Amino acid sequence: MSETFAKRASRRGYDPRAIEERWQRRWAETGLYKTDEDPSKPKHYALTMLPYPSGDLHVGHWYAMTPSDTRARFMRMRGYRVFFPIGFDAFGLPAENAAIKRGIHPRDWTYSNIERMRGQLRQMGTMFDFDAEVVTCDPEYYRWNQWFFLKFYEKGLAYREKAPVDWCPSCNTTLAREQVVGPDRRCERCDTPVIKRNLAQWLFKITDYAEELLDFSEIEWPERVKALQRNWIGRSEGAEIEFEIEGYGGVTVFTTRPDTLFGATFFVVAPEHPAVESITTPERGEEVRAYVERAARMSEIDRADVTREKTGVFTGAYAVNPANGERIPVYVADYVLMGYGTGAIMAVPAHDERDFEFAKKHGIEIRTVIAPPDWDGSPLERAYVGEGQMVNSGPFDGTPSAEGREKVTGWLRERGVGRPAVNYRLRDWLISRQRYWGTPIPIVYCERCGTVPVPEEDLPVLLPEDAEFMPTGESPLKFNDEFRKTECPRCGGPAERETDTMDTFVDSSWYQYRYLSPHYEEGPFDPERGSRWLPVDQYTGGIEHATMHLLYTRFFTKVMRDLGLVDFDEPMLRLFNQGVILGPDGNRMSKSRGNVVNPQEYVDRYGSDVLRCYLMFIGPWDEGGPWDPGGIEGVARWLRRAFTLVAGGDVSEAEADPGELSRRTHRLVKRVTEYLEGFRFNTAIAALMEHTNYLLAVKGEVGEEEWREAMRSFLLVLAPFAPHHAEEMWEILGEEYSVHEQGWPSWDEELVREETVTLVVQVNGKLRDRVEAPAGVDEGRARELALSSERVRAHVEGRELRKTVYVPGRLINLVVS
């Protein structure tokens, strides 16, 4: 041998930071992570949620990104052409607040942070393709936000209407959410109670896609996300019923229980309902107006709180129950929300808990119309919301309530006062923001032509550099005459631009498409590249985005399909939600709490690979938990010891039996493969640690060729987790650059067959011991082995064994009483 790999290693020594800096330079110089476009390989578009450029990457960013990077590397080594881009979600309120605090422009603060974070992302050792980077505050990006707005507008999916905002009657201005303070919702500037006021706002008509958004058949997403979206969309089947209010006209309600109509003994409208002012009698006017003002100061969350006392006032008006012709009083009450249903309800106190509480308080009749089981006809002590026989319901008496819903709806339809209906809790997406640092909405207002969209050829409508962005509660662009005053693109006359900017969730609803061609000028993305890469194969990100970003991006994709931009229905085929790494105090990391953990001190002390591996080792990725650096030294020791496998002396020249080394190596490859497929990074690293110990124990007992082959496989499966260490050790081994361009090792099923397995033994679901058992052991023998353990016997002696739960080859649970 010309030179052993141990001698090559000894010349360099072990310096993780020097190793990492050297290989990061080499990777950049050789373009190692430039996206492979080889069409003969299967595609894998891996995407992690783009970060907000807040200044520095904290440990939470590392926790989100390094496992995603590890899996993308794994897929690349398995023979996929992998697209793994990164960008920055750069518009938004934090930039304005930081700029105000520091007295600088939001643009300067944002781009300075982006530059710093780029370097930190490279230091992390990721395989991001930075050539695909997008920055959402760049005009070449937000131009296409505006283009999408125009397309939505053409399709009737973007519209303007009055929507409630927080308003300070003393300052005579709207307030941003953060300017409303305290439990009683007061203006932070003047301490005046804040009210709700309707102002013209722009919305996207996501409700047009509500039904389709309930279809998850084409995607593999966590059940919890799907459940959250189903609940957010809130589909309900029932009936719309028209009640006549005396002296006013018809008001429609939606109910899921038309079978209870005969029990409606009062009627309730939300404080914001447009009928309130008209139906209120003069003698009730002052009380009703005061109540409406109080309700306007409350949040919808508070109003919907089921534990809160139900309040309301009589309007003086009466409605007519269409089922029996009875006059019933009309109340205004804040437990009815304008945003759900029609903003009016038929109140059936016997069969609705909120209505029951309200009726008790106001002395309103509570009439049972669905008989509970064994009901004796006496008044109900609490609302009965279950099924039963219809009673006190005229021609429907004796009808089962489930059947009665359909029959009553049909009866109402025949009479022209009702119809079957589907209702959704989902509201249209309000995209107007009265802030500066966002995408200008491409609309102008002309006295002659009305609302006029900006022509596509005039995009982008640029955000002015010299705007005053100090918060006033109104759109900062409103005070910039140079921006606001313009010509009507239709008639050439004087006009004014829309001065609201777009919700930043618009930016992140389609960014995965722009990554494909960040500088493409003919459309939002290059369709040719789109045909090669879309849709996203694997998305990773937090579950906190379930009902906003993850819903909005699905909506956007469906609209893009209907615009002919894509030929599929869903943006991301598979989704994995990682947990949240919390601050040392157990709270989510944030600069305002002062609990952000800066990873730089750990990188400086141990290197990036150690921090990467530690974050993946501390527990299941989908669980997260508080940051605790207590175990990081152990991970550092492991990688240092792993390095000695190629640096700590030569191996034997003897030809030893390679059987056990080969078997263990093949088992390692299979285990790590399966763990990575299932996002079980912690167990994969545990397997690598265990195998490292074994290799150190047998080093010197096998021949060089067998050792080299075992080391090749070990380094290949180590590479996605500790890319710098694996690259360094691969070179020391004498292999060609780069380990990350090698194929993933395979395994022989004959060699991975276990002769023995370790059974976890539980008693009543609690871990009591582990026992060795022959592979393929049956339940009876497994029970015998479990009961042979002294630890297990201590928990079962003198107790009756009632049941055995056996997971073959893995676990046995003895259920005793």
Curated annotation (Swiss-Prot):
Catalytic reaction annotation: tRNA(Leu) + L-leucine + ATP = L-leucyl-tRNA(Leu) + AMP + diphosphate
Motif, 'HIGH' region: chain positions: 51-61
Keywords, comma-separated and alphabetical: Aminoacyl-tRNA synthetase, ATP-binding, Cytoplasm, Ligase, Nucleotide-binding, Protein biosynthesis
EC number(s) on file: 6.1.1.4
One Pfam family it belongs to: tRNA-synt_1
GO molecular-function term, one example from the UniProt record: leucine-tRNA ligase activity
EC main group: ligase
Entry binding sites for ATP: K591
Entry GO CC: cytosol
Position of sequence motif 'KMSKS' region: 588-592
Database matches in HAMAP family: Leu_tRNA_synth_B
Name the record gives this protein: Leucine--tRNA ligase
